[in-house]
């Protein structure tokens, strides 16, 4: 199974974008969850505006689907500036980055998603731009080549990544603000589902919102996607009204259990129990057993399973916890 094809994948899909733009909060006061990040950013933004400075460069990291792009857009809105958006894989040439930097207005935001995938050549251009607001450009070729410096207006670089550890130290050290986004609580996700339903003019009960939230793996992107699929079911089965019963039936149809697991999650956990006697099992063996890339397991599947206490990542390998045995109705084996 391709990770992006899963209904509970936290990776953005093309059909998510239009709806996400419609329901995405624009200001910090509408931003639900991440209380520490929100309170810190309120102070940092207000201070920058009082000093009439650009906000310090900001690195946002955490699992996919938690709102890194949303937060970047909120920062630009709160600062009252424009935002230019790109991603690490798109910036193939130094000239691509130079063109974006030279078109920025004072205090504008340049948002680079997947910043850990920048090439070394692009990073070399970024260093003086971030530190001194200067751009070094090579003119000519061969022996006649020379470097010229261009002054840039003060700007804010916001980098987003799911793999902060993959950033080089020189790049990471140039971010004055670093924020980690955590998985959301069920209470916060319930609020997000209710807010999204209101934006989409949907009728949904409080307990139905809670039902969607608790199966959303702590991730707003998944919650909003599940809400749209539950809406489809409600339109056909209940004249559009989303009750708890309708939500449960829709999610059962989608094969999403009460822990928010789909077939792939259950396959990973059951493989550890059945094929490897509960673990420990190495990542390569586990990837081969379930037919997925090791990066998919490490970056997409594991964070939620570990955070929820279903999986342990140890130096000797992955181990299924007693909670996993109970989830599969194998509580007796938890004491082996």
Swiss-Prot record:
ATP binds at residues 23-24, 65, 68-70, 131-133, 174, 184, 221. It catalyses: ATP + H2O = ADP + phosphate + H(+). Its EC number is 3.6.4.-. Residues 185-255 are annotated as: Small ATPAse domain (RuvB-S). InterPro entries: AAA+_ATPase, AAA_lid_4, DNA_helicase_Holl-junc_RuvB, P-loop_NTPase, RuvB-like_N, RuvB_C, WH-like_DNA-bd_sf, WH_DNA-bd_sf. GO terms for molecular function: ATP binding; ATP hydrolysis activity; four-way junction DNA binding; four-way junction helicase activity. Mg(2+) binds at residue 69. Transmembrane segments: none annotated. This is Holliday junction branch migration complex subunit RuvB. Has 3 domains, the large (RuvB-L) and small ATPase (RuvB-S) domains and the C-terminal head (RuvB-H) domain. The head domain binds DNA, while the ATPase domains jointly bind ATP, ADP or are empty depending on the state of the subunit in the translocation cycle. During a single DNA translocation step the structure of each domain remains the same, but their relative positions change. Residues 4-184 are annotated as: Large ATPase domain (RuvB-L). Residues 258-336 are annotated as: Head domain (RuvB-H). It comes from the Bacteria. One of its GO terms (cellular component) is cytoplasm. GO terms for biological process: DNA recombination; DNA repair. Belongs to the RuvB family. CDD domains: AAA. SUPFAM superfamilies: P-loop containing nucleoside triphosphate hydrolases, Winged helix' DNA-binding domain. The keyword Aminoacyl-tRNA synthetase does not apply. Homohexamer. Forms an RuvA(8)-RuvB(12)-Holliday junction (HJ) complex. HJ DNA is sandwiched between 2 RuvA tetramers; dsDNA enters through RuvA and exits via RuvB. An RuvB hexamer assembles on each DNA strand where it exits the tetramer. Each RuvB hexamer is contacted by two RuvA subunits (via domain III) on 2 adjacent RuvB subunits; this complex drives branch migration. In the full resolvosome a probable DNA-RuvA(4)-RuvB(12)-RuvC(2) complex forms which resolves the HJ. SMART domains: AAA (SM00382).
């Amino acid at each position: 199974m391709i990770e992006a094809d899963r209904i509970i994948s936290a990776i953005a899909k093309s059909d998510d974008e239009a709806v996400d733009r419609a329901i995405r909060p624009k200001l910090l006061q509408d931003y639900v969850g991440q209380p520490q990040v929100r309170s810190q950013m309120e102070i940092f933004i207000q201070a920058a505006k009082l000093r009439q400075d650009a906000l310090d460069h900001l690195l946002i990291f955490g699992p996919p689907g938690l709102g890194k792009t949303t937060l970047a857009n909120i920062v630009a809105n709160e600062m009252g500036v424009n935002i230019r958006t790109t991603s690490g894989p798109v910036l193939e040439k130094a000239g691509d980055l130079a063109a974006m930097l030279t078109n920025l207005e004072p205090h504008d935001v340049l948002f680079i998603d997947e910043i850990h995938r920048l090439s070394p050549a692009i990073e070399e251009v970024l260093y003086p731009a971030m530190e001194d607001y200067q751009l070094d450009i090579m003119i000519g070729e061969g022996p006649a080549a020379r470097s010229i410096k261009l002054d840039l207006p003060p700007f804010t670089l916001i980098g987003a990544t799911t793999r902060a550890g993959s950033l080089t130290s020189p790049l990471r050290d140039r971010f004055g603000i670093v924020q980690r986004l955590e998985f959301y609580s069920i209470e916060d996700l319930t609020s997000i589902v209710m807010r999204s339903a209101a934006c989409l003019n949907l009728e949904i009960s409080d307990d139905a919102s809670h039902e969607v939230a608790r199966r959303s793996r702590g991730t707003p992107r998944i919650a909003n996607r599940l809400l749209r699929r539950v809406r489809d079911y409600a339109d056909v089965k209940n004249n559009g009204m989303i009750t708890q019963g309708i939500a449960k039936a829709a999610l059962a149809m989608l094969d999403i259990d009460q822990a928010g697991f789909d077939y792939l999650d259950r396959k990973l956990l059951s493989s550890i129990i059945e094929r490897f006697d509960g673990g420990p099992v190495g990542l390569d063996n586990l990837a081969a057993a379930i037919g997925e890339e090791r990066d998919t397991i490490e970056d997409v599947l594991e964070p939620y399973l570990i955070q929820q206490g279903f999986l342990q990542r140890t130096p000797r390998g992955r181990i299924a916890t007693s909670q996993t045995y109970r989830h599969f109705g194998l509580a007796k084996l938890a004491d082996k």
